[in-house]
């Protein structure tokens, strides 16, 4: 336990020194990868391998509370309503893509006529959330899944993001 506490304190001290400019990075690294510059650890996490639409469904949420999804029999903590759209499905996915592209620190990873996958990075430490949208022809809605890669709590960020997108899409 003492070792874990020491590692945590040492890690925080190292980050603070790096951010204040008193510690030199140990290797040449692109500063574009993290909004905070060179950190001694990766806060983006690895891209999940279970993303995408399989048999008309997005992947279920993990048990951690930092995920929301509109499909499946999710508990209230994870459940969120799908996105409604009116008119042509192609126009709806195009409008959704434009909304997502306009959001800060967003990278679109995959885009088709019925699926959109984007990564959103947090402003301060560069934590990455994976957000997927699936234009569900059977339900005439856009199913959504938004999940943080790391940690337990997201302080409601994934739910807030989906609700902001819902509001923009309805305009």
Predicted segment positions?
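Bacterial N-terminal signal peptides that target proteins for export
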Residues: 1-12
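C-terminal segment of classical bacterial N-terminal signal peptides
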Residues: 15-25
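Ser/Thr-rich, low-complexity intrinsically disordered terminal regions
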Residues: 23-171
